[in-house]
Amino acid sequence: MYITPLFFPNLLKLQRKSFLTFLKYGIKKEIKKLDITKNKKKLLVYPNLFQLNLPTYTCNECVITSKTYNCELVIPIRLISYKDEIEWITLTNIPIMTNKCNFITNGSPRVIMSQITRAPGIYYHKENENTYYADIIAERGNWLRIEIDKKNNIWMKVKKVPKVPALMFLQALGVTKSNLIKLLKYPIPNQNHNLGNFKSQKEALEKIELYSQLESSINSRNLKNQNKITIFDRFMNPKYYDLGTRGRIQINKKFNNIEETIQHSTLTSKDFILAVHFLLKIKYKIEETDDIDNLKNKRVKIAGELIQSQFGIGILRLQKYVKDKLGNIKNNLHLTNIFSSTPINTTLAEFFGVNPLSQFMDEVNPLATLTHKRRLSSLGIGGVNRDTATLTIRSIHPTLYGRICPIETPEGKNAGLVNSFALFAEINSEGLIETPFFRVCNGRILYEMGINYLSANQEDKSNIVPFDIKKSRIGFLSKNKIAARIKQQFKEVSKKKVDFISISQLQMLSVATSLIPFMEHNDANRVLMGSNMQRQAVPLLKTECCLVGTGLETKIFFDLQDNVKSPPNGFISYLSLKKITISNIRNEHKSFNFKSNPLETITCIKSKSRNFNRLKYNLKDLLTNSKESLKITNYMSYVREQKIQYYIKQYNSSNQGTCSVNRLTLNEGQFIIKKNPLISGLSSCRNELALGKNLFVGYISWKGYNFEDAIVLNEQLVINNIYTSTHLEKFETEIKKNKENSEIITRDIKNISFLNKKNLDKNGIIKIGSRVFSDDILVGKLLPIETRILSPYRKLLYEILQKQNDHYRNTSLRVPKYKRGRITFVDYIKDKGKIKKKTEILKDLKTIKIHLMQNRLIQIGDKISGRHGNKGVISKILKIQEMPYLNDGIPLDILLNPLGVPSRMNIGQVLECLLGLSCFYLQRRFKVIPFDESFGFEVSRNFIYSNLYFSNIKTGNNWLLHPYYPGKNRIFDSYSGLPFDQPITIGKAYILKLIHLVEEKVHARSTGSYSLVTQQPLKGKSKKGGQRVGEMEVWALEGYGAAYTLHEILTVKSDDIKSRQKVLTSILNSETIKFGTTETFKVLIRELQSLCLNIQFFK
């Protein structure tokens, strides 16, 4: 039994579930912590009665007007001993997750990544041969370390505090020496040092130097008391220290401490004694150390929990703020004066704006968006540091199977620290990642019992076998002896001892990795590159489904919810590019009880047009008495004629500047089923994810143009717009207004020709649909300036040139250099929101936003890639008559270097292109599940050869499968018309165009800023930097003998300060450029002089 995409869980289920838990229980839990008492005044809060008001703006309006999509949290509060009245106070504005599982803050879609950290509890490690230590990790509070060093001394360490003897610390807490020796049971090494000679608790406190940094500020009299209070506060006061429920459970399980209750969230003296006791057990080889990289010792915080912890910090800040207010205000006590939403609002704004886990949503394509929401990071507050993270943290652990994808991770510093959830991964109530298995009993898979989710801890106790072992159709395991996994090791066990089996061969993979066909034939490094590069694929103008897929393309398309779906069954009564109307029959209202609800009292809310697709109708909405209601006399006629309208936005922009064009996929009058997609948008085709194009590929070197991963392309791909992508650029201009002078929006601008103003409307703003080029006016603006008093000479000059004294300066918004395209959107925003009518334009207008859409053809320098990590840059675009062609005259679309396959070990690309060739001639598409070798030996190769053989027979093209060199064909040279000497591999491969476009990379520096330290030009396009001429570039110029060019590059174009200021004057006066001394040379001399070498240089 194979789990098909129909049985896959929703890929965004984890994020939705977490945020809903926060709204239902998290808010209530944090508000309960609000305890405000000051000067006999107490505020009573009712956390169970909190309410969330609906958002003021829709998601679309928030994006346009740069606002945050949030809802108001109100709560009833009563001030005891003042008035008995209950007042509703606005506590904060909570950012709300959209139906696409992202947040909108200040108009920008953002994603909160999940964080994986060490679970709270105690963990034992071995550092060296004779050094052991235990780390006690809390949810809130300092980490504590207890260690035994080489000299058998037991120490206790806290960050930024000197270490103290651990047993002395216990004596300071009140445990006597005799009790310690009894409780520990095992012989204490180096007793004299560890226990000391203290007669009382006071002496132990005096000796401890745990808080030595406070000694200067504390009097000698209060030192004992202060030490005792500080120790208590550090680990035993709930205000400063919290183990959390999970931490307490873990410690109790570790020490078999049944007596300690779960509610006790701080450390006790008994915990310290048991911790030292267990450490001695490890010292004497009775117990084993913990594996901190095991997933049973890590827990995951998803968006809801991260926001909840931040909300809790805001509650503490609010508590402090209100207490200060209560202490200061004596008269006119009013809750609105005491309470403010600012403390919590600023805390949440900090989290969404500054926290590294809150990131701009990656919207290059739907796969990038989905993967970004399923990301799992070890970085951030409470996580690891990327600079100090060791190889063990980054490496693959056996417990990752089915929980975290071992392949998909970034290249570079974040490798192994940022991962993705596996397809079937779930999070339980304790924050542990679980993965599903089928139960096996006596060698038979119990499909009828459903699936069992196991955490890493539960998995250790069971014998588990992979999905791809041999089994019968009804679920009996074939072999008597099977290789099973138990406690992270493989052992051969009897089939009757097998407890669980995986549910799918895709179980260990992430979303992006599972889209790569034949990925099991590739090197893991190349699969990693393929997974990452699919997320960089630009949406194309003409989309096309892949001929060879894996079956998950449809699942991704439906789970993202970017596409408009129909909620009811019905037929399309009206269809246009802007609006779709669906008429349907409301079957659910046929059972309506007319006796208890007379028809005269039934009212229906007037239909309002909405911009969003998640429009839900229920009985409560229909039967609401409101001002905007319409009385219905015939209920059944209303039921039959109900209509739902969708308003479609044709062009959708993204954070990365890509653009999708929404297309209609249905016809007027067509009957549609519930959840049927109505439009095809970003990177989608036939309800599937479509990122690239199927091209005829040939693995042949061509005149050196495809040397080192360079790619040769057919010109027809440019002419036919095969790889043309749409990009949207946003322009914004603010209308400056002040008391003295304000900018004026107008069409009447002097010295501007009619051709430059023809696309402006009567107000001076560009019309939608206009085609604009570089330096064209988008918004005509004039700024009044003071009239200058002209001198007699200037007056005479103005009269001769017939020029008038200007009263205005032209401040119009223009199209930047080298940009052109079509205007798709113009929006007018005033101080208090969006302007709805064009008659209001000149009143209170604050900002104008304009979207410019441009089509970018593929060109030399663009980066393209396959799905197997086979990437390259286009080096040559050949005419169709110059490309090699097949036996039936079809020219190849793309030429790849054959040397790129054996060294990279990504054979999957060859298998894909050969199967794609048979797809083209058989007019079929194939879905190939990764790890298909489970169905038999060499299944992939046999399947491809059999399909090539079928296509050979069906089409009569005997050259498709040659008996002597199967998979290769003879192709013809376009210049001579003769076949090449050797047969080559040709096929159909799915090729992607990546966002690394040459148009955005090419940059030239004329003048720009210099670094203050080195006095050399800065680097980078954004800083208008220069191109670094390094050591090897200098050698190249030396090889050509270009002495003067090299001299100029290393001096006046670099850090010769005095000479570079005189270069322009020398060129204009036709003088010889004089070279001075460079700053680099001066630094070298200073370095040598600092070594006491008397080196001087003379002019």
UniProtKB/Swiss-Prot annotation:
CDD domains associated with the record: RNA_pol_B_RPB2
UniProt-listed InterPro entries: DNA-dir_RNA_pol_bsu_ext_1_sf (IPR042107), DNA-dir_RNA_pol_bsu_external_1 (IPR019462), DNA-dir_RNA_pol_su2 (IPR015712), DNA-dir_RNAP_su2_dom (IPR007120), DNA-dir_RNAP_su2_hyb_sf (IPR037033), RNA_pol_bsu_bac (IPR010243), RNA_pol_bsu_CS (IPR007121), RNA_pol_Rpb2_2 (IPR007642)
Keyword Coiled coil recorded: no
Subcellular location: Plastid, Chloroplast
Highest taxon of the lineage: Eukaryota
Keywords: Chloroplast, DNA-directed RNA polymerase, Nucleotidyltransferase, Plastid, Transcription, Transferase
EC number: 2.7.7.6
PROSITE patterns on file: RNA_POL_BETA (PS01166)
Family per similarity comment: Belongs to the RNA polymerase beta chain family.
HAMAP family noted in UniProt: RNApol_bact_RpoB
Subunit: In plastids the minimal PEP RNA polymerase catalytic core is composed of four subunits: alpha, beta, beta', and beta''. When a (nuclear-encoded) sigma factor is associated with the core the holoenzyme is formed, which can initiate transcription.
Name this protein carries in UniProt: DNA-directed RNA polymerase subunit beta
